[in-house]
Amino acid sequence: MAYPMQLGLQDATSPIMEELTDFHDHTLMIVFLISTLVLYIISMMLTTKLTHTSTMDAQEVETIWTVLPAVILVMIALPSLRILYMMDEINDPYLTVKTMGHQWYWSYEYTDYEDLMFDSYMIATSDLKPGEFRLLEVDNRVVLPMELPIRMLVSSEDVLHSWAVPSLGLKTDAIPGRLNQATLVSSRPGLFYGQCSEICGANHSFMPIVLEMVPLKQFESWASSMT
């Protein structure tokens, strides 16, 4: 999860988030090189006394600054399209969980189990236990098996919401009347926090998400105790 004064991305917990982190670094390096080149050219233009008053055109330069940006855009677009495909693809998910956004809480339904559904509300600051995080803890965590593909179906009962867990590379809009899909795979156990990422009203900031990723046997025991 995030910590105070953090400048970078959260530690990746899923293959998708690892790919997104690499793509971020790849794109950032390209932007850095372009910015450095532009600043260098501007500095040279401001400091040099040389002029080219007789130059009416420079086709070589025009060709370069047309072809080079096109090549750079391709270098950014290809890995981006690959990641978008990976985020949208899901084959034979082990589990499907339906997530519904409400003002201002989340409800979850494990569609592969009978009567396994619950609401998830934020725990008030006055009820927090030592070591728990303000505005991030919930009364019912979403328990899921690690290292297995999980399909999240996201929608809303009222207004626009957004179901987001940064460390897993997840951010899916919850739209009334529409069912969106996201793929979730956690590479390690633990608690992973998120929040509603779409302004949805007065208590938008009080819609946390907590995923508890556990080994498969522990998940099956939890599911049996809940049904």
UniProtKB/Swiss-Prot annotation:
GO BP terms, alphabetized: ATP synthesis coupled electron transport
Classification via CDD domains: CcO_II_C (cd13912)
Enzyme class: translocase
Domain of life: Eukaryota
EC number(s) recorded for this UniProt protein: 7.1.1.9
Mitochondrial matrix side: 46-59
Membrane-spanning residues: 15-45, 60-87
Keywords assigned by UniProt, alphabetized: Copper, Electron transport, Magnesium, Membrane, Metal-binding, Mitochondrion, Mitochondrion inner membrane, Respiratory chain, Translocase, Transmembrane, Transmembrane helix, Transport
Annotated positions binding Mg(2+): E198
Membrane topology, as annotated: Multi-pass membrane protein
InterPro entries tied to this protein: CcO_II, CcO_II-like_C, CcO_II_C, Copper_CuA, Cupredoxin, Cyt_c_oxidase_su2, Cyt_c_oxidase_su2_TM_dom, Cyt_c_oxidase_su2_TM_sf
Classification via Pfam families: COX2 (PF00116), COX2_TM (PF02790)
Primary location: mitochondrion
GO cellular component, one term: respiratory chain complex IV
Protein's UniProt keywords contain Protein biosynthesis: no
GO molecular function, one term: cytochrome-c oxidase activity
Cofactor (UniProt): Cu cation
Amino acids binding Cu cation A1: H161, C196, C200, M207
Residues where Cu cation A2 binds: C196, E198, C200, H204
Compartmental location: Mitochondrion inner membrane
Mitochondrial intermembrane side: 1-14, 88-227
Function recorded in the entry: Component of the cytochrome c oxidase, the last enzyme in the mitochondrial electron transport chain which drives oxidative phosphorylation. The respiratory chain contains 3 multisubunit complexes succinate dehydrogenase (complex II, CII), ubiquinol-cytochrome c oxidoreductase (cytochrome b-c1 complex, complex III, CIII) and cytochrome c oxidase (complex IV, CIV), that cooperate to transfer electrons derived from NADH and succinate to molecular oxygen, creating an electrochemical gradient over the inner membrane that drives transmembrane transport and the ATP synthase.
Family to which the UniProt record says this protein belongs: Belongs to the cytochrome c oxidase subunit 2 family.
Protein name: Cytochrome c oxidase subunit 2
Source species: Cratogeomys bursarius
Lineage: Eukaryota, Metazoa, Chordata, Craniata, Vertebrata
Recorded name of the encoding gene: MT-CO2
